[in-house]
């Protein structure tokens, strides 16, 4: 019996020792992995700072690419006698795909925070499109001693010493909480940095650049005489802004700069260029506009009252118009694929949904079409804005005028949201319309695309029914733009 107890005791002792050994090994592995992560990022920042000390080369900016402008086609009122019994297929030879959006950039390693006592962490409170935000910053923030490459490298090293980890972490948290797209995130970083330094000086620009870089974004820094600039790389070709082409990427200055600047061409690990997709609207503090009532002329029950968020409209006003894959038609898909805010959806969709309830799909689309055709006042962009400008759906509900682009974008958004029907944009030189894929074959002009029949719906052909093409549209030059 005593021998049995002895054996059991030995086994238990071995098990305890084995468990302790395993736990110690696991902890050692964790510490080693953490050290590897930290050394990887630390070394990346060390290499970057060292590269910054080298000579910054002069580069000449490429001239801005103007936004393409066609001679606009004025709206045309529909006459009943124009309705034809025969269907006409619109032959589309070119289809513009919508490139799949990529996930937002991430830091090269997870940002891990150690608890910080209050004296170490201060709060930077700032207004971002009238939305109150705050992030932790060190009590004593860094200041550059000069405006040269050595000072900038020294400043980069100081920012990378660990004191700004909480700042970076909080900024990334705000990106998630406010649903900020890449463009919105960059603007937020700049607003925070200038607030922290109470100035748009070189200190603020370096902090903004460091945070943007550490968040995973592709950027370069430039010196314009003694003024530091952030250059952001974009997957999109941005209109009306000069740029610097470096290693096949276009870089744009966050703030205006001269055409000849010195650039540090150092690249950071796993950097990713900005995307200008707005897959989710920024969740900003709501600042309601005045109530606007919109009503269909033919279907008086299609009537809504809406208040848009001025803060969101103000953000959209900063959005740079751009194209993808050297195709200017891709710009409209970026606007059309942006969702309406939840607040606006809750204001207009219940009323519209109630009015189309019980109707056939064609009748429902026809009422939505007439609503967009007649509830908005048409005006040329040149007259209102001095040049072409497309609206996000939210903007069309805010501004008093809307042209063919704005109407088609809004119509496509409403039909996809309320009826869950596929919609494409149809481009004619000087004009933009839409086509809807109905569950049944409907009468009217149509296009065949990906095995589906899309029936023409033109929100600027005033009073026209589903299936009617505006007169004088050259179908041989029409192109289809796919939407999500």
Task: Report the location of each language-model feature.
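Active-site neighborhood of thiol-dependent amide/isopeptide-bond enzymes
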Residues: 195-208, 379-439
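Positively charged n-region of N-terminal signal peptides that target proteins for export
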Residues: 1-4
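Hydrophobic/aromatic-rich core segments of domains that either
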Residues: 219-251, 352, 357-359, 406-484
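Boundary of Sec targeting at the N-terminus
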Residues: 19-20
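Long, contiguous, compositionally biased segments that the model treats as domain-scale units
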Residues: 27-30, 34-212
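Bacterial N-terminal signal peptides
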Residues: 7-14
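Extended, non-transmembrane interaction/recognition domains
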Residues: 207-208, 212-353
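Secondary-structure boundary elements
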Residues: 135, 139-143, 148-189, 333-398, ...
């Amino acid at each position: 019996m005593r021998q049995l107890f002895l054996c059991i005791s030995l086994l238990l002792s071995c098990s305890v020792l084995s468990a302790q050994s395993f736990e110690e090994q696991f902890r050692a592995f964790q510490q080693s992995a953490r050290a590897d992560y930290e050394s990887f990022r630390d070394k990346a920042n060390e290499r970057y700072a060292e590269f910054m000390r080298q000579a910054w080369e002069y580069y000449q900016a490429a001239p801005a690419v103007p936004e393409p402008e066609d001679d606009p086609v004025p709206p045309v009122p529909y006459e009943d006698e124009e309705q034809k019994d025969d269907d006409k297929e619109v032959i589309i030879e070119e289809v513009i795909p919508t490139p799949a959006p990529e996930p937002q950039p991430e830091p090269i390693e997870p940002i891990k925070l150690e608890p910080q006592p209050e004296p170490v962490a201060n709060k930077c409170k700032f207004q971002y499109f009238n939305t109150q935000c705050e992030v932790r910053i060190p009590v004593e923030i860094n200041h550059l001693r000069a405006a040269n490459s050595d000072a900038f490298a020294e400043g980069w090293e100081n920012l990378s010493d660990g004191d700004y980890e909480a700042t970076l972490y909080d900024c990334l948290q705000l990106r998630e909480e406010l649903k900020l797209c890449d463009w919105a995130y960059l603007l937020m970083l700049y607003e925070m940095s200038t607030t922290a330094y109470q100035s748009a000086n070189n200190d603020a620009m370096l902090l903004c650049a460091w945070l943007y870089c550490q968040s995973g974004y592709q950027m370069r820094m430039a010196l314009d005489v003694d003024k530091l600039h952030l250059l952001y790389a974009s997957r999109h070709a941005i209109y009306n802004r000069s740029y610097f082409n470096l290693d096949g990427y276009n870089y744009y200055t966050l703030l205006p700069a001269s055409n000849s600047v010195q650039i540090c061409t150092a690249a950071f690990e796993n950097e990713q260029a900005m995307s200008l997709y707005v897959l989710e609207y920024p969740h900003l503090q709501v600042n309601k506009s005045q109530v606007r009532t919109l009503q269909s002329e033919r279907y008086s029950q299609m009537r809504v009252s809406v208040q848009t968020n001025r803060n969101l409209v103000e953000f959209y006003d900063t959005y740079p118009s751009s194209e993808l894959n050297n195709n200017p038609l891709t710009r409209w898909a970026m606007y059309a694929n942006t969702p309406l805010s939840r607040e606006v959806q809750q204001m207009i969709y219940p009323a519209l949904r109630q009015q189309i309830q019980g109707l056939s799909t064609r009748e429902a689309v026809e009422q939505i079409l007439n609503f967009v055709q007649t509830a908005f006042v048409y005006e040329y962009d040149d007259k209102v804005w001095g040049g072409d400008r497309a609206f996000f759906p939210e903007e069309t509900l805010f501004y008093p005028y809307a042209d063919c682009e704005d109407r088609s974008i809004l119509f496509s958004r409403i039909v996809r949201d309320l009826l869950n029907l596929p919609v494409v944009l149809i481009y004619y030189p000087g004009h933009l319309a839409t086509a809807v894929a109905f569950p049944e074959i409907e009468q009217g002009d149509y296009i065949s695309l990906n095995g589906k029949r899309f029936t023409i719906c033109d929100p600027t052909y005033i009073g026209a029914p589903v299936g009617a093409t505006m007169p004088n549209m050259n179908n041989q030059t029409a192109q289809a733009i796919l939407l999500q």
